Regions:
Chain A
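Sec-dependent N-terminal signal peptides
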Residues: 4-12
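Short active-site neighborhood of thiol/selenol oxidoreductases, capturing the structured segment around
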Residues: 29-44, 156
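Loop/turn elements at helix/coil->beta-strand transitions in domains of secreted/extracellular proteins
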Residues: 31-34, 63-66, 90-92, 111
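Second-shell loop/turn segments in exported
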Residues: 40-42, 69-74, 139-145
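The canonical Cys-X-X-Cys-His
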Residues: 43-46, 114
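Structural microenvironment flanking redox-active thiols in thiol-disulfide oxidoreductases
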Residues: 47-87, 98-105
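Thiol/selenol-based redox catalytic cores and closely related redox-interacting motifs
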Residues: 99-181
Length: 181, 430
């Protein structure tokens, strides 16, 4: 299990672009579940899952947690992210990981890639699931009409109930995150 | 000493040059990724500037190595076809070496890739732009699963005179959501009747078949293609006031999209141009058990009139995993015409051969469709796999052969034979 680090990133809220740099630290109460989804404003695979990601956000929020959408491509600005959130009806907090600090921390490889975090009794965050959001895409170019397996949804539900998760990692498929040079 | 010097010289000559964006990579992108990955194209993102490509270079290499991009599913084993898309191994390797070298931009003038010029059509049809069809953010089951993520639209051409159509160009306001469009020319107003059933909604929720004519009989476009262009010397005869019926297959993009369509028809028929007809090879019904991953359906057609086959439009659902069509002459010589070893219904555009293939009277056209009704088929719409019993009067799996009779005066005989075959198959399978 990996532990979350405190990371300095740019961030904005979904409805009003603050446009300022702030320090953002992931924190949670014991038993709380947070979700991080690595994404990109123009990755068609991540975008196709936007409604599902928003549904997960609502369910996590209702349980007291948060979902953070992390845009990974360096060319993105707050304005791009705000327009993307508006277009796709996303209401979660959006992070632009310009320097790939979050990408490197979680060894994220593609978008979309999800990380589900459960805070234990003393508030220590632990990754209980990482990988595929669902099985809408078998691989890039191989898309089902609709997803039939909902891995993140299931992991969140299990985390909230503090139940064990059978598979903690599913190799994600999507748009490759270009390595920083 | 001389040997050492020569070895050094040769070693220096064999040292591959480091590729740069300006000298090497932009040309590869230009020839393989345009026009989709530019403004108004179907590509999800632009690949025009250095930053666009450098920011996705590894993804580009993966998709091209895996054959996902450029979109092209036709096997090389059939007849040579026009407008084949495919990036070479050498080109992919060049992009990889460019990545390994740190993606140098190179010296020279700033390079950005630009689009093409303006071509004026002879006739145009479009849906009402004031009432676009709303593509939902996610796929939604409709009144039966067979028409999921499909909508058929009527595009009146209002041509006062008959036309000899040689090509058809498609445009849409939602190019990233539209994956495939199957066209039929309707001169009987049948599609208008279907469209009128729900006057408040643009289009209608049915396949684009018109009578016995399957959707796509007059061309089909897929990812990477927006034009159906008949080979030189052939045309479609189109009567006055034709409607172009556009069975539109869309892929929800995650956000609501407003869909309007238009088609441009072009007349560029030369003197002596031959009218094209459609011979339909098909399986009307399939019955497949759950988990059967190797079900094969075949059909044989004995061609009664010599024809030149200029192209083929394939059609089958996602439960189909592969298909091929071949011709066998009276001496038993078999020629594979078209083959898909990895069929994806969203990539089944019309293909035209670089040279017409002549089928003589009495030759046999054999079609075979492979179905994988198991969970190992990543596109199987029936998940978990379930018993399938599908039937359609225009066929659940087809090859539409675009042909011209060798003897022009036999055109009506060919038409009548094709129609009788379609009726016969409908009676035979209940």
């Amino acid at each position: 299990m990996k532990h979350l680090w405190c990371i300095c990133v740019f961030f904005l809220t979904s409805c009003a672009t603050k446009g300022i740099l702030e320090t953002h630290i992931l924190q949670g109460e014991p038993g709380e579940v947070d979700v991080i989804v690595f994404s990109s404003t123009d990755c068609p695979i991540a975008n196709a899952m936007a409604p599902e990601i928003e549904r997960i956000h609502i369910s996590v929020q209702n349980a007291g947690g948060d979902l953070f959408l992390v845009h990974v491509w360096a060319g993105r600005t707050n304005i791009d992210a705000q327009k993307h959130a508006d277009d796709y009806g996303l209401t979660m907090e959006v992070i632009i990981d310009t320097e790939h600090e979050l990408v490197d921390s979680f060894n994220a490889t593609v978008t979309p890639e999800a990380v589900v975090v459960l805070y234990d009794e003393d508030g220590t965050p632990k990754v209980i699931y990482q990988g595929l959001v669902n099985n809408l895409f078998d691989s890039p170019g191989n898309r089902r009409d609709e997803a039939t397996q909902h891995y993140v949804r299931d992991a969140v539900a299990a985390g909230i109930k503090n139940e064990a998760i059978s598979t903690s990692y599913r190799a994600p498929t999507g748009c490759i995150i270009e390595q920083k040079q | 000493m001389i040997e050492i010097l020569l070895a050094t010289v040769f070693a220096q000559q064999e040292e591959p040059r480091v590729p740069t964006w300006k000298q090497d990579v932009h040309e590869i992108i230009l020839s393989n990724c345009m026009p989709c990955h530019s403004s108004g194209g179907a590509g999800a993102f632009h690949l025009l500037r250095y930053e666009d490509v450098a920011g996705r270079a590894s993804f580009i290499v993966e998709l091209t190595r895996n054959g996902v991009m450029p979109p092209w599913k036709v096997d090389d084993s059939g007849l040579p076809v026009h407008h084949k898309r495919g990036i070479s191994k050498e080109e992919i390797e060049t992009i990889q070496r460019w990545i390994d070298a740190g993606k140098p931009e190179g010296d020279g003038a700033e390079i950005a890739i630009c689009g093409g010029g303006l071509v004026i059509p002879d006739a145009t049809g479009h849906t009402n732009p004031d009432t676009p069809w709303i593509i939902p953010a996610e796929s939604a089951a409709r009144w039966h699963k067979g028409i999921r993520d499909k909508r058929t639209f009527v595009l009146p051409i209002n041509n006062p005179n008959p036309m000899k159509v040689t090509s058809l160009k498609f445009s849409t306001t939602a190019p990233r959501a539209v994956q495939m469009v199957c066209f039929v020319f309707d001169h009987q107003g049948r599609a208008r009747m279907f469209d009128g059933w729900d006057p408040d909604e643009p289009g209608y929720e049915m396949m684009g078949d018109i009578g016995w004519v399957p959707s796509g009989a007059h061309g089909k476009i897929g990812p990477g293609s927006g034009v159906v262009s008949l080979p030189h010397g052939f045309h479609w005869e189109v009567p006055p006031n034709i409607d172009v019926v556009a069975e539109t297959h869309f892929r929800p993009t995650g956000k609501i999209e407003q869909l309007s369509l238009s088609v441009d028809l072009f007349e560029d028929a030369i003197e002596g141009s031959r009218a094209v007809q459609e011979i339909v090879s098909m399986i009307r019904r399939i019955v497949i058990e759950a988990d059967d991953d190797a079900f094969v359906a075949t059909e044989h057609l004995d061609i009664p009139i010599a024809v030149d086959v200029i192209g083929i439009t394939p059609r089958a659902g996602a439960e189909c995993s592969g298909m091929n069509i071949s011709s066998t002459n009276s001496e038993g010589t078999k020629q594979l015409l078209l083959s898909y070893s990895d069929w994806d219904p969203h990539y089944g555009e019309t293909v035209f051969f670089t040279k017409p293939f002549r089928v003589m009277k009495g030759d046999t056209i054999t079609s075979a469709w492979n179905f994988n009704n198991s969970d190992s088929n990543p596109r199987n719409p029936f998940v978990p796999a379930q018993f399938i019993d599908l039937a359609r009067k225009t066929g659940v799996a087809n090859f539409v052969l675009h042909v011209a009779p060798v003897q022009v005066e036999q055109a009506s005989d060919l038409y009548e034979w094709n129609l009788s075959m379609l009726r016969k198959r409908q009676r035979a399978v209940q």
